[in-house]
Structures are given as C-alpha cells and as structure tokens.
Amino acid sequence: MLKKIMVIIVIFAVVAVVYPYKKLAQTGFQFLSVSQVSRASGMGEAFITICDGADAVFYNPAGMVLMRSRLFEVSVNNLQWIADIKYSSIGMVFSPFERRYGVFGMSIMWVDYGVFYGTMVYPSLDGYVETGTFSPRATSIGVAYSKNLTDRFMVGGQIKYVALNIGRTVIPDAISETGLTAKDFVASVTAFDFGTVFRTGIKSLVFGMNIRNFSKEIKFYREGFQLPLTFTMGVSFDLLDLVDSEKRGNNSLLVAVDAVHPRAYPEYVNLGMELKLFGTFSIRAGYKSNQDEYGTAYGFGLEKFGLKFDYSYTPFKNFDGVQRLTLKFSI
C-alpha cells in the first residue's frame, strides 16, 4: 500500500514539473476559477486539506470521504460576483454501505452574466447597427468519487461537463449572399479533477494535493484555448492540538496554507485561519498573495442539528465587495 501511495505522489510531482510555466493568460472558461463555498472564501481559499463532504467537490474531491454525516450531505451556494454576474452552485455527496465502497458526489454550477446589447459595424452615421440582446450562460455538471486507501490516505476524482454560451453574433461570410452570417458561439468540453489528502498521524497535521480543470484544448470559432488548469499543494494544522485537551474543550484553531500554480497567472499562496468555538460558531480570515484586485477575506459560520450556515465577504479595490452565502444540510 505504501508503494501505491508513493506512486500517486510521484505522479502529482511530475505533473507539477512538466507544467507549462511560460504560458500565462492562455485560458478561457475563467468562471471555473471563482470560489463557490463561503467557508473556503472566508479562509482565503486555503482549503484543499480541510474541505470535506459536499464542499470538497469544488476544491479537492479526495475530501468527500471525510464527510461528517453518515449518509447524505448537500451544500447550496450563492454569490453576486463583480459586474452583476450571478453564480449559483450545489454540491452533493452520498455514502452508501457505511463507506465500504467510498463516497459518491455530484456538483452543479451555473452562471448568469446578465443581458447585453449586440452591435455590428455598419456604414451609417453611428458606424454601427444594433443586432439585439443576448444573455451569456455558463454551466458545469460533474460526478465525483472518493475513497480511503488507508486510514490516513484518501484519493478522489471528478469528471465534469463544462459549457459556455456567449450568445449569437453576426460575422463576415464570403459565401453568403449578404456577406454576413449569424453564428451561435457555444463551446463545451469534458474536464477532470484529481486530488489526495494525507493525514500524517502527527496530531492534526494534514497534507494535500490536487489538479483541477484538466482537459483538451477547445475553441469557439478559430483560435483554441485551454481551461484554467490549476495545481495546488496544501498543509493544515489545528493549533489547539498543542493545548491540553481539557483546556481546549470543543474548540479548534485551524491554520491552512495552499501554494497554487495556475496556468493563467503567476504562482501565489493562500493563507487561512478558522477559530471554532463550542463546535458551533466559527470566525474566519484569509489572504491571497500576488493579487491585483483583492487579497483579504473574512467570514463566519453557524452549525447545529445537521444544519450549517456560512457567510464570507471579499473586499475589492475597484469593485463592490463580493458576498457569499452557503447553506448545508446533512443526515
């Protein structure tokens, strides 16, 4: 079993080494890079080693097997992104037969970009003519699986269908009688996520790795592009593990660090902290390095009787701050 674990770790290391470092800003479908879960965002997205259950389908599918409920868990997320772009997502996990056959999951995400007015170059006084309105839409639907290889090592993967419809436009066409033709710009592709979580056995020290949005090249019309492929390594630890168990009670102070290597941007680091009091109320703060528009984030959470509510706020420099809401239910 140790050999299998080492092979998986080596595969992740090789992927990180051969990753095309010089190709920055060569990706599309950037909606896949926007954080969905309030708890993750409130911790600066330093989340791949602490995500569990339904939240894990959006960050590290290996964490699904760490779900706290016995059978079923669902997470509903909503956020108003910049420029009035609306994100909604649902994560679900199901653990039949007391996890003897692993944990199964599903993720659904959809994005509403609002209504836009189309125009076309035209030899008129204004130099253009309106072509009507259009409403871009984006969708991601995935199925996932996670399993314990040992009591300390977990693996998981997700296959997802992602699509982006940016509407219909009129383009030049030499064959057409009018010299113009209408075209729907729609692109879709199958993408994959892979992840691991390793509990060291040294108190609560956890390591994790994951790859998100691995796919073939796609294109709308002529030029091809890649999805926002991202490789992440992370570590987390509960600082209250250093305190006597009688003094700490049902409290925790999680600290997490993720090193992120995206295809489209230079590398950066996510830092996050979560203080949980009495196993019910959580306060969070996070920081993302090497960002132009935003860096800090804050949040809180409440959980009781299988219900959980999370909220986070991310301030932006030149835009209104982004608020995220998450409702979680488990049985």
Language model features by range: what are they?
Residues M1-K4, D151:
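Positively charged n-region of N-terminal signal peptides that target proteins for export
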Residues Y21-I331:
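Subset of outer-membrane beta-barrel
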Residues K4-V14:
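Sec-dependent N-terminal signal peptides
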Residues V15-P20:
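Sec/Tat signal peptide C-region and signal peptidase I cleavage site
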